[in-house]
Curated annotation (Swiss-Prot):
InterPro entries: LCN-type_CS_alpha_beta_dom, Scorpion_toxin-like, Scorpion_toxin-like_sf, Scorpion_toxinL, Scorpion_toxinL/defensin
Cross-referenced Gene3D superfamilies: Knottin, scorpion toxin-like
PROSITE patterns, sorted: LCN_CSAB
One example GO MF annotation: sodium channel inhibitor activity
GO cellular component: extracellular region
Keywords: Disulfide bond, Ion channel impairing toxin, Neurotoxin, Secreted, Toxin, Voltage-gated sodium channel impairing toxin
Protein known as: Insect toxin TbIT-1
Compartments where located: Secreted
Pfam family, one: Toxin_3
GO biological process: defense response
Amino acid sequence: GKEGYPVDSRGCKVTCFFTGAGYCDKECKLKKASSGYCAWPACYCYGLPDSVPVYDNASNKCB
């Protein structure tokens, strides 16, 4: 798999600015990642399937 910042439906990073411990690990696992953590202020995932979109500065569509 790959690693990176998962994105929401708007193409924005998943924020962990106000979330508790374990939030990003849960969010990443919902996206079939092996694990994740809060790379404050956004979630970062490890072991993502190649089909899952991750944040890319070049093609960022976040509004």
